[in-house]
Regions:
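Sec-dependent bacterial lipoprotein signal peptides
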Residues: 1-12
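Acidic/polar, low-complexity intrinsically disordered N-terminal segments immediately downstream
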Residues: 11-144, 330-374
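Beta-strand secondary-structure signal
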Residues: 31, 117-119, 201-203, 214-216, ...
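Short, flexible beta-strand-to-coil junctions
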Residues: 35-41, 123-125, 218-222, 312-317
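Tryptophan-paired
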Residues: 66-131, 226-330
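Short, low-hydrophobicity acidic/polar segments
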Residues: 87-207
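A sequence/structural signal for flexible, mid-protein segments enriched
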Residues: 167, 171-268
């Protein structure tokens, strides 16, 4: 996705700035030019942009919107601001925080002369009234760590420290600027004669902290063998947490649980196929600030990424299929479409619950499920 910019404008009346060390006065901060690309926009190869629409066959209808909301990112309009005054020393440790929340694009606050650090992140809009994101602002004032907790869903793969999969986070974006100087000589300010104000502009890049993945298991030649999905899936090997200031994902790999839905007779280049589709958010790759990367050559991911989906067959038996999507995830390091395809002419209907019944697997992953390398 294309980075969005938060243009802060610090305003004060002419001829004096009216900021005092002992008695700070109000200064207006204005957000401008806030635009957020709805989908992914980055290079998958040198000079090659990612075209997700050419890969996505599941579609997006009214029921999908009811379950997940928009298919892509939604522009936030409410922001949390954390301001840290570091006195005469830029890039110093934070000893105190000033917190504010704003609606719209204007903030009225007070600033002392000296250096400031500023962190901005969107307020969370909930569909069901339950927030998954947790914000740790007390362990250290130098950064804010965000994370989710474990769900009731089992984590079967590549989550060595945790027995359960984690809830997916909500959409989250942040921008962080350090060593913002408020100077009594107006250094770094510009004068606006129309408004009779001194203006200091801070172009802060709004980057995603959570990343959207669209998953689709495309079933060819189904002929009624698979009749639906259990309704949930998991995707493994992603960061458990992230740091708002840097955008860097934590080092602990976890599985993330998400909803899935079954659709019949989807069009795939003229062929009618059935698809188990889903949408999930996560904190990206462990140890990476994915939103700040520019090419997949910068990705040094060492985790394996498995996607599992429980499919329901026409004889009443369910079967969990596990797909190795590691390379797809590394290629789509900022999110995107993950696709696997099954040809039901080569897959037998299972005779016992839990078993995939897939007789063309690379290797058996565990007794009830199989790993399928794509």
């Amino acid at each position: 996705m294309t980075p969005s910019r938060l243009a802060f404008t610090a305003c004060s009346p002419e001829p004096e700035l009216h900021l005092f060390e002992a008695e700070p006065t109000s200064t207006k901060i204005v957000f401008a030019e806030l635009e957020l690309d709805a989908y992914w926009d980055y290079e998958v190869e040198v000079g090659v942009r990612y075209e997700w629409r050419t890969e996505w066959y599941y579609g997006w209808d009214a029921e999908d919107y009811r379950i997940w909301g928009e298919i892509g990112y939604v522009i936030p309009n409410t922001f949390n601001i954390r301001r840290y005054f570091t006195g005469s020393t830029p890039y110093a440790h934070h000893t105190k925080v000033i917190s504010n929340t704003i609606e719209g694009n204007t903030f009225q606050g007070e600033f002392n002369y000296g250096f400031w650090d500023m962190l901005v992140f969107n307020d969370i809009k909930l569909k069901d009234g339950v927030q998954s994101l947790n914000f740790d602002e007390t362990t250290t004032l130098d950064s804010i760590t965000v994370y989710t907790n474990q769900s009731m869903a089992k984590a079967r793969y590549n989550a060595p420290r945790y027995s359960h999969a984690f809830y997916e986070p909500e959409e989250l974006f942040s921008a962080y600027e350090q060593a913002i100087e408020i100077d009594r000589e107006h250094k770094g300010f510009e004068y606006d004669p129309e408004r009779n104000l001194w203006v200091k502009r801070l172009n802060m890049v709004l980057q995603p902290i959570t990343y959207i993945y669209l998953t689709q298991v495309i079933v060819h030649h189904n002929n009624g063998k698979i009749v639906g999905v259990e309704g949930t899936g998991t995707l493994s090997g992603f960061a458990r947490s992230s740091v708002l200031n840097s955008g860097r994902g934590g080092e602990d790999p976890v599985s993330v649980t998400y909803q899935t839905r079954w659709k019949k007779d989807c069009d795939m280049n003229g062929e009618k196929v059935d698809i188990a589709g889903g949408r999930l958010l996560n904190f990206g790759l462990c140890g990476h600030a994915c939103g700040r990367l520019h090419s997949k050559q910068e990705v040094h991911d060492t985790e394996k990424h498995y996607m599992d989906v429980k499919l329901l067959f026409n004889n009443g038996i369910d079967s969990t299929f596990v797909f190795d999507v590691t390379q797809q995830v590394r290629d789509r390091y900022k999110g995107g479409v993950l696709t696997v395809e099954l040809d039901m002419d080569t897959i037998s209907v299972p005779s016992r619950s839990g078993g995939s019944g897939f007789d063309a697997v690379v290797k058996e992953f565990e007794e009830e499920t199989h790993e399928i390398e794509m």
